[in-house]
Amino acid sequence: VASGLIAPWCLSRAEGSQAASTLAAVLAGEQVIALAWQPEQGCLEPDGTGLLATPQAEGSLRVSGTARFAAPASADGFLVAARLPEGLALGLLPRDRDGLVRLDEPAADGTASALLRLSDVRLAADELLARGPGAGSLLRDALDVALVASAAELVGLMDHALDLTLDYLRTRKQFGKPIGSFQALQHRAVDLWIQRQLARAAVDAAVAVLDSPGADARARTQAASSAKARAAHAALMLCNQSVQLHGAIGFTDEYELGIYLNRALSLSAWLGNAAEHRRRWGALADASGALTA
């Protein structure tokens, strides 16, 4: 869900007939466009893109470099962010463009992202969506939205995983009574409920910041990192503990809980895990003076 928001967000704010026609195709379900920019895990800022662009005649570019985690790998095209001397360039590349090599990288939840290797790939002038400082701002805003959306998805899977676990505690019997009647397990279940509520509160707070017309770019990014850090940490804790509370059945791929666990493993790492976003939040807070004694 979250990865599907980035391309429409950028396309709807870009100019030109190419952006408009591609946006219409994406909204109609005729095309899927994946963002490609991260050279490695832990790169959270658009300026850290692994793609370099060289200006050519008539406004075109030649792009080379490596980008990972373009999801989904089966996308019809890629929204690439490449570095120029004056900032970033955002452009659309079809998956079959000459010089573009794609390798699938499977994830824990059964999905796959693409590793792209670009060697002097031509990006035509009419395929450019934005360039310069505006391109960086556009991508940063899109990533903030995607982070909050991924945090919201994590909260949603926590809802289902917790409901499944509580129902199991009510029905599974041991020593002649439901195991949910044992106080030690009740305490663990309450801890999971608290983690879910904290994650939901962080997402609600981030949505409020993103919806606020007065929020600046730093506040939006800080709120997005806060939501992702909290939700990623809580989702992994809740799903891991839910497996323990279920016992042996929680380890089986056929059981529904495994779907939530594997999705939490994959989504919590996408666009940065909890630890990376805590560090990012701290750096932003420090830069703004919020941590000054």
Sequence positions of predicted segments:
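Internal helix-loop-helix
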Residues: 1-20, 24, 28, 70-77
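A generic local secondary-structure boundary/capping motif
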Residues: 22-24, 41, 50-53, 66-71, ...
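Alpha-helical interface subdomain recognition
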Residues: 25, 29, 55-57, 61, ...
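A short, Trp-centered hydrophobic/proline-enriched beta-strand micro-motif
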Residues: 29-40
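A generic structural signal for well-ordered coil/turn residues at beta-strand boundaries
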Residues: 29-31, 47-49, 73-76, 87, ...
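Residue-level signal for inorganic ion chemistry
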Residues: 35, 91, 118, 158, ...
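A short core secondary-structure module
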Residues: 60, 64-101
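Flexible, small-/acidic-enriched active-site or ligand-binding loops
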Residues: 69-70, 93-131
